[in-house]
Design a protein with these regions (language model features):
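N-terminal secretory signal peptides that target proteins for export/translocation
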Residues: 1-12
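Intrinsic disorder/low-complexity segments in short proteins, especially the signal peptide
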Residues: 8, 22-24, 33
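Hydrophobic alpha-helical context, especially transmembrane and signal-peptide helices
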Residues: 13-14, 228
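Bacterial N-terminal signal peptides
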Residues: 15-27
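Boundary at the C-terminal end of the N-terminal hydrophobic targeting segment
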Residues: 29-35
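Mature extracytoplasmic or organellar-lumen-exposed domains after removal of signal/transit peptides
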Residues: 35-264
Length: 264
């Protein structure tokens, strides 16, 4: 097909406009990514206090035998590292929560202790972090200055923990005779996943460009909100709503893995 002279002149005039629009879009993406993650909504909108507190209690009970001796620690260290990261996310959510609770003034100290527990080089360091976490859990520490949302742990370990918790949630929340009985436990899992997603907004994968950084923020926010929706559906004992929310969580995970990063 041959273009007329008028059409050729029109195309030539439009090229600078197209390039200018592309430049504006790129500049907007760069500015938005440089500004950091968007402000988080109130924590109560995606992570109920009761779920977070119950998860803290669950982790304390689980960690106690693992940290009872050096031998037990060596056997359970790999699992402890992952669980300490999800505990960190729950504690940061409690620290920043918009509702009052027993750990409101101590969750920040516990967050730091959980982070140290996850990265402890040996049993002695793990014990020191564990003692600090327990003291704060008993209310024996002073409050730390207000923290900001930040990553829960090293990305590779956090992603493995997300995969583990997500798989457990999918299996446990299937419609059937056991749905109602396991709803509270599964709601806690969904809430912890929501907290991990919010923390992950602050940990953009290395080498991510400006446009994909914005996409990362959006995917993390969507994951947070969908897991919060899943938790609410489970608390309501609504199997259909739970299944629908989990299907969208699955789509989010696929978009994250395929579009931004590949799990090792």
């Amino acid at each position: 097909m041959r273009l007329t002279a008028q059409s050729q002149r029109l195309i030539v005039r439009q090229v600078p406009l197209v390039l200018a629009c592309a430049t504006v879009v790129a500049a907007f993406a760069n500015a938005a990514s440089a500004a950091g993650p968007p402000a988080a909504p109130p924590v109560s909108s995606f992570a109920p206090v009761g779920d977070l507190m119950a998860y803290v209690d669950e982790c304390v009970a689980t960690f106690t035998p693992v940290l009872a001796s050096a031998e037990a620690y060596d056997r359970g260290k790999a699992r402890l590292e992952k669980d300490a990261d999800s505990l960190s996310a729950a504690l940061l959510a409690l620290h920043l929560h918009d509702q009052e609770h027993r750990l409101k003034h101590h969750a920040g100290v516990m967050f730091h202790a959980a982070q140290q527990l996850a990265t402890a080089a040996d049993y002695a360091a793990a014990q020191q972090a564990w003692q600090a976490l327990q003291a704060a859990n008993r209310g024996e520490t002073s409050a730390v200055p207000q923290l900001d949302w930040q990553r829960a742990g090293e990305m590779g370990i956090v992603m493995k923990q997300v995969t583990l918790l997500h798989g457990k949630l999918k299996r446990g929340a299937r419609p059937g005779s056991r749905f109602d009985g396991a709803a509270e436990e599964n709601a806690r899992l969904a809430t912890v996943l929501a907290a991990l997603a919010q923390c992950s907004q602050s940990d953009v994968p290395p080498g991510t460009n400006a446009a994909d950084t914005i996409k990362w923020y959006d995917l993390c926010a969507e994951m947070r909100d969908l897991c919060g929706e899943t938790s609410r559906a489970l608390h309501a004992r609504d199997a259909a709503a739970t299944a629908a929310a989990l299907a969208r969580v699955e789509q989010n995970c696929t978009a994250c893995h395929d579009g931004l990063r590949k799990q090792p």
